[in-house]
Amino acid sequence: MLNIQEIMAIIPHRYPFLLIDRILELEPGQRAVGEKLVTINEPFFQGHFPAHPIMPGVLIVEALAQTGAVAALSLPENRGKIAFFAGIDGVRFRKPVYPGDTLRLEVRFDKMRRGIGKGTGVATVDGQVVCEGELMFALHVER
């Protein structure tokens, strides 16, 4: 398990765009399971939507991507690199995510070759799928 400080040592994201709170399971270069505790204090709830707050779907996808980035960048040979989002396919949003929900984020890599990766992401709340799809990324050496 990784806490927020350990996550921030691996990926460059920071408030208000760091969208994972902890990593529950990690197999470097293969898979990761993360968690986001969704609170009404999230900045995006000010406008999405004030009378009916739901987490924007694109931010659920970003949280999945950040979880995948932790798995990819945990490999010793990838330390110091950045994982850029390269694409998404077949993303589906099944249920809304509300303040008070605990978002479980699981990413498993299907392929990773020469700095390009592809994987499957599934986000759940209380065991029910809220979002799923394929994620692609490219590793980049920071300048």
Swiss-Prot record:
Q: Which residues form the active site?
A: H48
Q: What class of enzyme is it?
A: lyase
Q: From the UniProt record, which GO molecular function terms apply?
A: (3R)-hydroxyacyl-[acyl-carrier-protein] dehydratase activity
- HAMAP family from the xrefs? FabZ
**What's the catalysed reaction?**
a (3R)-hydroxyacyl-[ACP] = a (2E)-enoyl-[ACP] + H2O
GO terms for biological process, alphabetical: fatty acid biosynthetic process; lipid A biosynthetic process
Which family is annotated?
Belongs to the thioester dehydratase family. FabZ subfamily.
Protein name stated in the entry: 3-hydroxyacyl-[acyl-carrier-protein] dehydratase FabZ
Q: Which domain of life is it from?
A: Bacteria
Where in or outside the cell it occurs: the entry states: Cytoplasm
Which species does this protein come from?
Answer: Roseiflexus castenholzii (strain DSM 13941 / HLO8)
What InterPro entries has UniProt attached to this entry? FabA_FabZ, FabZ, HotDog_dom_sf
Pfam families assigned to the protein according to its UniProt record, in alphabetical order: FabA
Function text:
Involved in unsaturated fatty acids biosynthesis. Catalyzes the dehydration of short chain beta-hydroxyacyl-ACPs and long chain saturated and unsaturated beta-hydroxyacyl-ACPs.
Give the main location. cytoplasm
The UniProt keywords, alphabetically, are: Cytoplasm, Lipid A biosynthesis, Lipid biosynthesis, Lipid metabolism, Lyase
Write out the GO cellular component annotations.
Answer: cytoplasm; membrane
Instruction: State which Enzyme Commission number(s) the record gives.
Output: 4.2.1.59
